[in-house]
Amino acid sequence: MGNASNDSQSEDCETRQWLPPGESPAISSVMFSAGVLGNLIALALLARRWRGDVGCSAGRRSSLSLFHVLVTELVFTDLLGTCLISPVVLASYARNQTLVALAPESRACTYFAFAMTFFSLATMLMLFAMALERYLSIGHPYFYQRRVSRSGGLAVLPVIYAVSLLFCSLPLLDYGQYVQYCPGTWCFIRHGRTAYLQLYATLLLLLIVSVLACNFSVILNLIRMHRRSRRSRCGPSLGSGRGGPGARRRGERVSMAEETDHLILLAIMTITFAVCSLPFTIFAYMNETSSRKEKWDLQALRFLSINSIIDPWVFAILRPPVLRLMRSVLCCRISLRTQDATQTSCSTQSDASKQADL
């Protein structure tokens, strides 16, 4: 009886024509406004950096790195997804009709579900590309310098869009199916009837794990860079002029600071996506016979949508001064802990060299 009740409730949600009484567009309106505003602010900040980079001399033109190119593509993807998805929901609330009834042959429902799966996958692929770029930059610098270029980053976006388009078009080819969910303001992959939803969720999980693995590798390499720079302080400081060891050490410190800033930004975006994807992942792996609540399904979708709202605000808030503050807080204890050890090591080496001279 319980399974039959769940099946009938699911079928009612899939074919419902009118929204239930009391449904409010307030949350959807706030999410749409926050998403558009945040992405526009982030794009404006990135555009200013692009203009500043164009105005720089050739020797300083590396200030806009490949990482910032990928961030620009991520923000553009989030803005495009917000502008193409949210208006459909607002139109449904305005007409008090479900997505199935909003257009003939459930076209609005199919469009919404396809766009939702497409932009969610594209966002995760962009985060993976950013994490892979950091991994190659830190872990394999020679390969990175020879094979990876800033102009090559411009090709990442169309490649990601092509992959996402092919994967998300499978339900249109009868592998999987897009259906409407309660209260009728959103559509997604049919739950439990095919393996496509589990395949989609598994792909997102694999991408999240890959991003976390790349970030962990970057953290280990940054720790090694910190230890090397700490040991180099014990060496002679001769040739502090241009091109000397002093200049090299300053360049290493600047490079490490920039990499740490990029890692902080990428780590926060990755954690955000992982947290926002968790309810959807639980929703995807739940059994069809379990008692799923309408509100839980809707909250899972909203959590997945929130990621495209948070990402640009993270970039807009974490400006270089804020990143420097966070870096100083994160590194303060390590520096204080290692300062005494560094001085002790340096004095020990100095005493040993004096005894050798005697």
UniProtKB/Swiss-Prot annotation:
Which PANTHER family does the entry mention? Answer: G-PROTEIN COUPLED RECEPTOR FAMILY 1 MEMBER, PROSTAGLANDIN E2 RECEPTOR EP2 SUBTYPE
**Region (Disordered): which ranges?**
231-253
Q: Which residues are glycosylated?
A: 3, 6, 96, 287
TM stretches of this protein: 24-47, 66-91, 112-132, 152-176, 199-223, 263-286, 300-323
What are the record keywords, sorted?
Cell membrane, Disulfide bond, G-protein coupled receptor, Glycoprotein, Membrane, Receptor, Transducer, Transmembrane, Transmembrane helix
Q: How does it sit in the membrane?
A: Multi-pass membrane protein
Q: In which tissues is it expressed?
A: Placenta and lung.
| Family matches, as InterPro entries | GPCR_Rhodpsn, GPCR_Rhodpsn_7TM, Prostanoid_rcpt, Prostglndn_EP2_rcpt
Q: Which organism is it from?
A: Homo sapiens
Q: What is this protein called?
A: Prostaglandin E2 receptor EP2 subtype
Sorted alphabetically, the Gene Ontology cellular component annotations on this record are: plasma membrane
Q: Which loops or segments lie on the Cytoplasmic side of the membrane, by the record?
A: 48-65, 133-151, 224-262, 324-358
Q: Which GO terms describe its molecular function?
A: prostaglandin E receptor activity
> Which CDD domains does the record cross-reference, listed alphabetically?
7tmA_PGE2_EP2
Briefly, what is this protein's role?
Receptor for prostaglandin E2 (PGE2). The activity of this receptor is mediated by G(s) proteins that stimulate adenylate cyclase. The subsequent raise in intracellular cAMP is responsible for the relaxing effect of this receptor on smooth muscle.
Q: List the disulfide bonds.
A: 109-187
Record PROSITE patterns: G_PROTEIN_RECEP_F1_1, G_PROTEIN_RECEP_F1_2
Q: Which GO terms describe its biological process?
A: adenylate cyclase-activating G protein-coupled receptor signaling pathway; cellular response to prostaglandin E stimulus; G protein-coupled receptor signaling pathway; inflammatory response; positive regulation of cytosolic calcium ion concentration; regulation of cell population proliferation; response to lipopolysaccharide; response to nematode
Its annotated compartments are:
Cell membrane
What family is this protein classified in?
Belongs to the G-protein coupled receptor 1 family.
Topology feature Extracellular, residues: 1-23, 92-111, 177-198, 287-299
- One Pfam family named in its UniProt record: 7tm_1
